[in-house]
From Swiss-Prot:
Disruption phenotype: Does not seem to affect germination and growth, formation of sclerotia, ability to penetrate and infect host tissue, nor spore and mycelium surface properties. Its main location: secreted. It is found in: Secreted; Secreted, Cell wall. Aerial growth, conidiation, and dispersal of filamentous fungi in the environment rely upon a capability of their secreting small amphipathic proteins called hydrophobins (HPBs) with low sequence identity. Class I can self-assemble into an outermost layer of rodlet bundles on aerial cell surfaces, conferring cellular hydrophobicity that supports fungal growth, development and dispersal; whereas Class II form highly ordered films at water-air interfaces through intermolecular interactions but contribute nothing to the rodlet structure. Keywords: Cell wall, Disulfide bond, Glycoprotein, Secreted, Signal. This is Hydrophobin-like protein 1. The lineage of its organism: Eukaryota, Fungi, Dikarya, Ascomycota, Pezizomycotina. It comes from the Eukaryota. Residues 1-20 form the signal peptide. Glycans are attached at residue 36. Disulfide bonds join 61-121, 71-113, 72-104, 122-139.
Length: 145
């Protein structure tokens, strides 16, 4: 009986010691994730280069990003090769999560945009004149108005 009490006491002592480890180990990945989310959120909202920012502001985009209203048949993320190349040509880095339009054309307030195309408010539209690309950058969906 005495041996059983010692075994139970020893088991309780070991089991409480095993669960009493500091919680700092799982806390480190959580803090790392929170820091990365904060950094990502801050870069998503960074402004485009002043030299390339559109001067043609649309009333429909005034509350979104002060951009121009465009209609684009395709959209691509900022990490796609065509977008990365265009950004590098003009000496800036674009966030990989940004929305960018390809094959875009300017539309004016209340103008029609075909159902299968994307209505975007874009802050950089100077690259829309490029012959093969017609790229609009730093965009937000106009539906978010």
């Amino acid at each position: 009986m005495y041996l059983l009490q010692i075994s139970i006491s020893l088991l309780l002592l070991i089991s409480t010691a095993a669960t009493a480890l500091p919680l700092s180990t799982p806390l480190i990945p959580l803090l790392d994730t929170l820091i990365n989310i904060t950094i990502t959120a801050s870069t998503l909202n960074s402004a485009p280069p002043t030299a390339l920012t559109t001067t043609t502001h649309s009333l429909e985009c005034a509350d979104v990003n002060q951009g121009a209203l465009v209609c684009c048949p395709s959209i691509v993320d900022g990490d796609q090769p065509v977008v990365v190349m265009a950004a590098k040509m003009f000496g800036f880095v674009l966030n990989g999560n940004s929305v960018n339009g390809v094959g875009c054309r300017t539309i004016y307030n209340g103008a029609y945009c075909p159902v299968l195309e994307h209505r975007l408010c874009c802050q950089v539209t100077d690259l829309m004149v490029l012959p093969l690309v017609s790229l609009a950058m730093w965009c937000h969906r106009a539906e978010e108005l």
